[in-house]
Amino acid sequence: FRVAVAILGISMAVLACRVPVKGSGAMTTDLQIDAQLGESRWPREAEATRSIADLIARTIEERYPADNRPARRDAHPKAHGCVRARFTVEDTLPENLAQGVFVPGRSYKAWIRFSNGDSDPERPDVLGDARGMAIKLMGVPGAKLLPEESTDETQDFIMINHPVFFIDDPRDYLTLIKRGSSTNPLVKLLAPFALGLKGAMIARAITKKQIVNPLHTRFWSMVPYRLGDDARKQAIKFSARPCVAHANNNIPKDPDPNYLRKAMANTLSTGDACFDFMVQPRRSETMKVEDSKTEWRESEAPFIKVATIHIPKQVFDTDAQMDFCENLSFT
């Protein structure tokens, strides 16, 4: 049961979509709570957030000492590759969705990184794991929330191949990573108990997942994000789904340890790939913004296609492009 190491760190990117308030330090944990969108503050949330960030930083430093650099990501360190793409917004959209980056008809250059979630970058792909899809749109104008990215013209979307996350309370997450990073084997064994029964079941489902090809896999944001700043602002989740369903879901026999990269390379050596990018607007107060362990049912809140992701035929697995991939960051 690899919960403590399989997806550590990802919740720093996907826990509640807060708006940081400008502070004096490089990182601020002051949070603006938007009750209109269903947000509420967890007890000791700011303190837990600071502790989580500090502990993750220490864990990376310990995992990658000076003689073992460069350091990798704390989670999703194994990249299958970064591919060039084009993100094109639909020509017509409902008024409540036609805001932010979703300007009808607009097209963005993009980079997409596909990955495994486990902290071991050498772990064979055939073993169950969370699989990541991180999209970086280029040429996006407008103010950014993070002070260190205030002049960047980018927009990131971070997803994994599961619709929900295994934890929501930052205090429980802090307990999880403290136990998971402990050098005491007995303490490490206690890590899953920080999740509770429902969280443990979700974590087990996530870390057992096997896939045939990242380009044939659906991905979800797991948690809500805010779309818009004015009276039309709303909480949404998002998802990327292959434009065409693929019938072959059989894991290859005796696969190469990096067979997911090879599968992507084979697909893009002969043709293009495509995803529908969709958003799921929050429809009612029963869809809890702070509950990342409960899925918003599509029967109650259908996903709406807002853009098409076109990945052209290409060679992406060169040493130079893999190095470029390692240097991309997603927030």
Residue ranges of model-derived segments:
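Bacterial N-terminal signal peptides
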Residues: 4-13
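Active-site-adjacent core segments of small-molecule enzymes
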Residues: 21-331
